[in-house]
Amino acid sequence: GRIAGCLGLDNLIMFYDSNDIQLSTETKDVTTEDTAMKYRAWNWNVIEINGNDCEQIREALNAAKAENQRPTLIIGKCIMGKGARKDDNSSYEHNCKTHGAPLGGDAYKNTMLNLGADPENPFVIFDDVKELYAKRAEELKGIVAARVEEEKAWACANPEKAAQQAEWFSGAAPKVDWTAIKQKAGDATRNASAAVLGALAEQVPNMICASADLSNSDKTDGFLKKTHAFTS
C-alpha cells in the first residue's frame, strides 16, 4: 500500500469490504485502526460509501477511474449476512457465524425466501438479469475488439518494443552471459550477490530489485548502480 501511494499508481483501484466482522469476533474487539486515515496518509484517494448501495458503488468507481494522481481505496461499509435469516427466521445479520460457515437447514430456506428467491429453484436467472448480461457481453466484445486493434497499431508503429514485450511475457528465461560476472576469492556473500545483481541489471531490462532501506548494507545497490531507481 505504501509503495503504491508513493509511486502514485492511479490505475490501481482496491475495494475494502468493511463489515466489522471476522471469523471469531467482531473487529472492534481486536483493533481500533482507522483504515481510511491510514491509506490517506499513504497518499491514497479514499472513498467511503454504503457498500450495499449499487448506485454508490457505481459513483465511487467512476470517481476512482477519474483520479489521475493516486491509487484509490473504496471502503464499503457493508452488512455481514445482509438479508440472512436463522432457523427461527430471526435476523442472521452482523453474525460471526456467517463468516466461515454456510447457511444450513431452515436458515438457508428462510434466507432465500426473505431475499425473494425460490429455495426449490435457487439458481434461476431472472429475465431482466439475462437481458442486462447479454447487453453487457455485446458491449465488452466491442471494447475488446477496439483494444485488439489499438494493440496491433501500436505493435506496427513500435516493432522493437512489441518484440521485447512479447519476449518478456513468453515465459522464456532471459539470456544472461554468466561469464560477465567477476568474483573475488573469499569475498563476502553479499558482495558476491552484488556482482551478480549488477550483471543482471545490465542484461535483464525487465528485472526489478527491491530492498527495504538496506541496499547499502545487503549490497542490493549492486543492482541500482547499474540501472536507476524506480520512482514516480
Language-model regions: role of each:
Residues 131, 135-232:
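Thiamine diphosphate
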Residues 1-134:
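Glycine-rich ThDP/TPP pyrophosphate-binding loop and its adjacent helix/strand module
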